[in-house]
Amino acid sequence: MKVLRTPEKRFKNLKNYPYKPHYTAVESKKGDNIRIHHIEEGPKKGPTVVCFHGQPAWSYLYTKMIPYFLKEEVRIICPDLPGYGKSDKPSKREDYSYQNQVDWMVQWLKKNELENLTFFGQDWGGLIGLRVVAKEPERFNRVVVGNTGLPYNPNVPKSVLKEREEFIKNSETPTLYDIYNNLKGMKNKSPKHQILKFMYWQKYCWDTEDLPVGLLMSMIGGGNKKLSTSLYYAFVQMGAEKFYPFKPEIAKAFDAPFPSREYKMGVRSMPMQVPIIPDSSLAAQKEARDFFKSWNKPFLSAFAGNDPITNSMEKDVLKMCPKALKAPNIGGGHFYQWTKPKELSDIIIKFIKADT
């Protein structure tokens, strides 16, 4: 396995990221070492929350939330998934299976001897993290999830599978305009409808070798004016992103892990791994979902409520875990850790304190 490591100089002078790095070596199935990075702040004797990020973000996504946890003396740990942030980046598409990510993060959890945890996950952080919780339940006291879930669609019509396959193989790469229009159309629709919308994001990410992560996060995560975003997008389309003179801080931060396109295999390939159709993860998904049906520890569903990509997943999460509680929807879109940091932190902290 060829593994890439982002030079530390790429992370110098990042705004609001003064945190000491922690590294843990895990092992791939082939015996290769993969170094996983995490940040860890707050009192070791206090309650501990572990926050998993999604695609295409990294632990920087939680920088706005960290001060709220520290104020309440809650220890917060935020790892970077392999392929993201300061963690090592395997270079091949086949390295980024759903199962590999689960296995690597279980190793990370065990090697750091973490226990008495509150888990929080969003996007891929929830897909991976919920499977980790199901594998190591004794290490977790409670679970909070938002804008995520454990997708399980074993009975997708053949006509839908064929239409998706044809699109992925033969259609032109979608534009960001195509993606925007299709993703916003996912809200509260049937699984069939969502598959044929989400495929635009899957194809765009895979086809775009130099995925403009900074631009995407500045659009999805807020922090950029409409005119500035349009201008920024024009530079990206011309292949002149590095010459764009008004790059926002959020874009700089989320571009930092990727010195070149070779480092982006994880962010490109993982959307295709989302199990919205029957695939190799089907049995493991069912096993994890069955586990949460009998989960008897505190579980909180805390969705934004205005994220069209994941809105319909909240009902599924509540069905999957019958004893789960539902928090009020706070808005903020897909990456509400960035847009609603205080509101989301308050929900998690209140949930922890109610149970301690």
Show which residues each predicted segment covers.
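Structural cue for short, hydrophobic secondary-structure segments
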Residues: 51-54, 78
